[in-house]
């Protein structure tokens, strides 16, 4: 039985997500798998790659052949270099930057002074100006 490590397509149309699986080479792309050893989500920025390194090393050790796409993923994570004994086993995988948490104001108020717009002040001034011409029109009518 020839065993391959390849991608199994998941997700929706135009939103691909893949599972990295160990499968008999004679099975269909999305057919029955022996073991799932990772996840690949190319649409995220940076791409999300998660391989279970010890299981990948085991399957490579017993003779499983990676597909071209999985080989590229293994080079990014450093699993291929680790298997071959090459330098660079730490890989080149980039981690996403963390989001900065929201910090509430010190005085406990939910309203932030910078959030108040000057439009509110202009709106208060405008009705006063509109009321003055209306009074002038009333005097002219008398």
Swiss-Prot record:
One of its GO terms (cellular component) is cytoplasm. Keywords: Ribonucleoprotein, Ribosomal protein. GO terms for molecular function: structural constituent of ribosome. Pfam families: Ribosomal_S16 (PF00886). Residues 126-142 have a biased composition (Acidic residues). One of its GO terms (biological process) is translation. It comes from the Bacteria. Disulfide bonds: none annotated. Residues 88-142 are annotated as: Disordered. Belongs to the bacterial ribosomal protein bS16 family. NCBIfam families: PRK14520.1 (NF011093), S16 (TIGR00002). This is Small ribosomal subunit protein bS16. It comes from Kocuria rhizophila (strain ATCC 9341 / DSM 348 / NBRC 103217 / DC2201). The lineage of its organism: Bacteria, Bacillati, Actinomycetota, Actinomycetes, Micrococcales.
């Amino acid at each position: 039985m020839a065993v391959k490590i390849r991608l199994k397509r998941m997700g929706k149309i135009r939103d691909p997500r893949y599972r990295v699986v160990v499968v008999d080479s004679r099975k269909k792309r999305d057919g029955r798998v022996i073991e799932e050893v990772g996840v690949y989500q190319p649409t995220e920025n940076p791409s999300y790659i998660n391989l279970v390194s010890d299981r990948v090393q085991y399957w490579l050790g017993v003779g499983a052949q990676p597909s071209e796409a999985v080989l590229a993923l293994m080079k990014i994570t450093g699993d291929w270099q680790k298997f071959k004994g090459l330098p660079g086993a730490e890989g080149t995988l980039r981690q996403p930057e963390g989001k900065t948490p929201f910090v509430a104001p010190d005085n406990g108020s939910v309203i932030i002074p910078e959030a108040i717009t000057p439009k509110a002040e202009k709106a208060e001034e405008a009705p006063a100006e509109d009321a003055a011409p209306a009074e002038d029109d009333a005097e002219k009518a008398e």
